[in-house]
Structures are given as C-alpha cells and as structure tokens.
Amino acid sequence: MSKKSVGKIVRIIGPVVDVKFQEGDLPDIYDALVVINPQTGKKLILEVEQLIGDNIVRTVAMDSTDGLVRGLEVENTGEPIKAPVGRGVLGRMFNVIGEPIDEQGELKDIEYWPIHRPAPSMTEQKTEIEILETGLKVIDLLAPFPKGGKIGFFGGAGVGKTVLVMEMIRNIAIEHHGFSIFAGVGERTREGNDLYLEMTEAGVLNNTVLVFGQMNEPPGARFRVALTALTIAEYFRDVEGRDVLLFIDNIFRFVQAGSEVSALLGRMPSAVGYQPTLSTDMGELQERITSTKKGSITSVQAIYVPADDITDPAPATTFTHLDATIVLSRQLAALGLYPAVDPLDSTSKILDPNIVGKEHYEVARGVQEVLQRYKDLQDIIAILGMEELSEEDKLIVQRARKIQRFLTQPTHVAERFSGIPGVYVPIKETIRGFKEILEGRYDDLPEAAFYMVGTIDEAVEKAKKLMKSAVI
C-alpha cells in the first residue's frame, strides 16, 4: 500500500488520463486515484495502469472523463478499488466501484475488499468433482456442470444466451437455495433492467447480487466490473463457506473493453487488433474462479462469438479455461428448438463414466450417436426422401427427431411470452426419459408430444391428448 499523495492531470485521451506526481510520491500499479469532475461535482475514480517516466502515471477512468481539464488536482488513495462484501450486499445492485445504483438506501453489515486479489494456492483448492444439477435436460445429460467449474455459453447474437443464464439464476436460487452473483459486462442496459425486474417478480433477488458495467459505460468500467463481482463471490466462498454461482454476461465484452484501452495505453495490438496481454488478462480473472476446501465458485459465462467465428482470439482464449462448453446453435433456434443447445458440439470434461456413472454416460453417448447418424442421413433424405432409407435408418431418424424435441424444455423466465409453464427436471428423470426413448418404448408416439415438455411422463400425457384431439 503506497502513501497518500496529490498529483495533477497533464493529459487526457478519452478514458485514459496521465497524472504527474512529485518525486517520491508515485502511486503503485492498480492504486485508485480520486479527482472531482468540475462539470458534475462528482468523484471520478482513476486506476493506475502504467508508470511512464518523469513521475507520470497513466490511468484508466472508471466513468466518463467529460469535463476534466489539465491541471486538476488528483488524490492518490494509496489502495486499489474496493468492493463491498458481506450479507448486506444481497439483493442489491452495484457499479464497478461498489456504489449501490438501485436507490435502496445505504449498505449495512458490510466490509470492503480490494478487487485485485491473488488466486487461491494449489494447496487450498479442492480436487474432488461433483455435478451441479441445473434442471435443464440438455445440459444435465450431455454437458453436465462441475461444481466449482467454469462453463462457457457460446453463441452469436439472439440465440438465447441471456435467457439460459437467467433461467439458471432462478433454478439455483429456488431449487438449491444458493447465492448468485451476476456481472453485467458491456451488455444492454435494458437487459439488466429486465433481469432486475424479473428477479424481483420471481422472488429470487434476495439471494442475488447484481454488478453492472454496461454498454453505455467507459471501457475502464467494463474491464473491471467482472473483478468487482468476483470479489463479492470470493467473500461468500472464503468467509461463509458457500457454494456460489457467478454469472458473467458477457465475457467477450471484458476482452473488448481491454482492447479499447490497450491502444490508448500505448501497447502494440496483437492478432485481430486485440491487446497483447489478452491471455494474462483472462488468466487473472479465470484463475480466481475455483473450488477451495471452504466453498466453491461455479462460473457460467456467456460468450459472444463475433460473426459466429469460434477461432476469433477472444472466444479461443476463453476456451482454454473452461470445464464445459455449451454451444448455442442458430439453426436450432430457427427451428424453435429452445434451449438452442447443440447436442453434438456441446461438451463437458466430466462426462466420464467414473464421475457421472455408467448409466448416465451410456445414455448420453447413445443420444449423441443417434443424433449424429440422423445428421449424416440428412443429405440422403434431402435428395432421395425418407422412402429410400433402410428400415433401421428410418427408425433412427424417427427416434432422433423425438430426442431433438425432448431436448427442448419450457423455461420459467420465458413463461411470460411463451405461455408455457417452466419446468425443472431432476437428472434421474432426464436419464430415465432418454433411456426409454433409446430403448424404443415410445416409437409409436407422435414426435410433437415430446416438444416443450419436462419429464417423459409429461410427453406420454401430451401424446394421449394429441391422439384424442386427432380422433375428434
């Protein structure tokens, strides 16, 4: 911790501000500096990123620099940006510097932790693997989440990433009575507002903390807001021994914000114009997300894929840190098959018979085999039609189409616009349902019966109703 001192602004380029200090008074890297913006009268926080010589430090602003002028006095706080932690933050909404933005009064029962913290050492980390049940069939069966792991939701714009994240927040709060921390990183302000209102309506807000640095905010705020949310999650893991869910929407915007300030900080850009420190920035965030002997942080990260190009450096760098990848397919979304999770591209490191059990593993692989065979046959069907297939292949196609529809599920958060009540399906029911479809028990049922239902029993009931209405 450096001593408090006062400097003067000598240069302003967008969100990057250079501040000159007296000899021997230089702040440390990541120290928070405070300047009063004469235009607004409010405090503006600047974070020190570089020491550039001549007693000048280069900083990134956490809010708009409009109104700042050269010569303004800047005070060094002598410590990094700090986030509020403790029971008092539950049910509240914050910005990057830990200020409440929900107009719900002052914070009580809290303390402050710096947002830059070391990752837990190897000796503190827990190595046993447990499954985290999400209640979503396609995820629990084909890409199960490890407790304390990192899960990526990959998809372009408009394929349902945010709806899936919101559904999981709801399931963790209501079904698991767990705490969720949501970091809105560079996404639409409207979505943040919708999330807040929906969580209030669903009664899950009291178990959740929301931290926002949205699209309209400067890159400094978007670059650091994930660390603020992570610090709050670390408190619940390390002090209260809780299993916490950390949602980051969107991790691509974290990288994007870093690349915006990187050039202004004087760094040479690397591949596709990203910052040369891309891997380091990502590693500093991701390595802190882990299970310890006290508790766990399971992270679900929505990852926007620019132009649907999965080889772009931002999603590609994120891939290396993930334990499970959920790939959202535009083709499935276009067919109305929600959640639009690609059952063949989505993977999990824990889909292993030694971890999930032999039955779960065999059913999951059986489902993928049938779907892969159906995919291989689609060209033949398009050219020659179903009639040219062998009886065995016809049966595979029928089962695959039922499986495809049974992988869909009505969500609680989409209930308002779909009109179908949401369902939470336990893993045992999910495995039983798909196992019975693979065994051919429901070969005589219409495929429409499997669309947007929860358990296999619901599909059977729906089939009876469809048959009755067909008779009438």
From Swiss-Prot:
One Pfam family per UniProt: ATP-synt_VA_C
Q: Where are the transmembrane segments?
A: none
Q: Does Membrane show up as a keyword for this record?
A: yes
Q: What class of enzyme is it?
A: translocase
Show the PROSITE patterns listed in the entry: ATPASE_ALPHA_BETA (PS00152)
What family does the Swiss-Prot or TrEMBL record give for this protein?
Belongs to the ATPase alpha/beta chains family.
Name listed for the protein in its UniProt record:
ATP synthase subunit beta
Q: Which organism is it from?
A: Fervidobacterium islandicum
This protein's gene is called atpD
